[in-house]
Amino acid sequence: MANYRNNPFTFVYDGAITKNEKGKVNVEKVSYKINGIDIAANVYKPANYTPNGKFPAIVVAHPNGGVKEQVAGLYAQKLAEQGYVTIAFDATYQGASGGKPRYVDKPANRMEDIRAAADFITQYPGVDKNRLGLLGICGGGGYSIKAAQTDKRFKTV
C-alpha cells in the first residue's frame, strides 16, 4: 500500500497520482455545500482535458466507512485514464466533509450526496451534462442504484 504521507492528495492506493502533470490525469480538490454542510471532493480530469470539451462524467460513490482517497479515488482515477471526468466525494458526516454527528451513514443522506455530486460535476467546465454515469462501490453501489431510480440525469449505473 502506498504511504499517504508521501502524497499531497493523501491517496492510499498504489499507482496514485502524486502530482498534477501536463498530459496526464490530473486531480483537483473541490468543495460544495449540501444544506449548509461542506462536502469535500476530488475531480479527476483526463490527460486530454480542456474546459471547452464535452467530456462524459461519472460520479463515484465510496463504500460505507470509506473515503474519497481510498477505492473510490482509485476507480475515479482509472476512469479518468479512459477519458471521463470523474468526481469522488466524502459523504456528508464522513471523511473531510462536514456535519455532526460524525460517521453517520443514512441512506437518504447518501442519495442526497450522490445527487449533489451530480449537480456539481454537470456544471463543471468541459463536462457534457447529457452523458452522466454513476459508479457505486459496495454500500455506495446500493445507494447509487436507489439514487438513479429517481434521478434521470444518470444514463448508466
Locate each region found by the language model.
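Primarily recognizes the serine-hydrolase "nucleophile elbow" in alpha/beta-hydrolase
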Residues: 116-157
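N-terminal cap/lid segment of alpha/beta-hydrolase-fold proteins
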Residues: 4-53
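The serine-hydrolase catalytic nucleophile loop
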Residues: 65-77, 91
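Conserved dinucleotide-binding and phosphotransfer motif residues
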Residues: 35-37, 82, 124, 150
